[in-house]
Amino acid sequence: MIPLTLRRAVPADAARLSLLGGATFLTSFAHDHPGDAMVAHVANYHSVDWYECLLANPDCAAWILETELKAPVGYALLTPPAVDCPTDPGDLELKRIYLLAPFQSGGWGVRLIEAVEAEARARGAEKLYLCVYSANQAAQRFYARHGFADTGHKQNFRVGEVEYEDMIWVKDLA
């Protein structure tokens, strides 16, 4: 197993997160999302500017997983909730958690979730939300194993002109 290091991302990591975010999004969804729309989506929502804004926001936090040679292979984002269901003040959202395929199933996703949950608890959050693509059964199984449950609420996720359904899940941290 390749040794990896998990650390808190800093503003200087925006370009690394941008590349990693784009790569993992394309890898995860290229099988059922239109190509041109995916490229445009990555250019907008995985741009260096997008990550610079996120990393500059004190309400947000990010973690990056790297090899010994500092190559980024995974990341997670914690943000205020932007979900289409009722939330309480102080609740937070696990906005993104992705690993490059060769680094999945080695316990690193668990380490990323543990880092996010520890920070959410330190901030006093009682609930941690996330959105998961309704067709992503593997992610749903992973989240269920780690205490998240489907709220029954849905929201649409657009890539270009195509809408996809996300399920809103929550974990009680109290």
Residue ranges and their predicted role:
Residues 63, 88-92, 126-129, 133-149, ...:
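C-terminal "cap" of GNAT-fold acetyltransferases
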Residues 4, 8-14, 18-32, 37-102, ...:
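Acetyl-CoA-dependent GNAT
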Residues 107:
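Glycine-rich phosphate-binding loop
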Residues 1:
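Short, conserved catalytic or adaptor-binding loops enriched in Gly and charged residues
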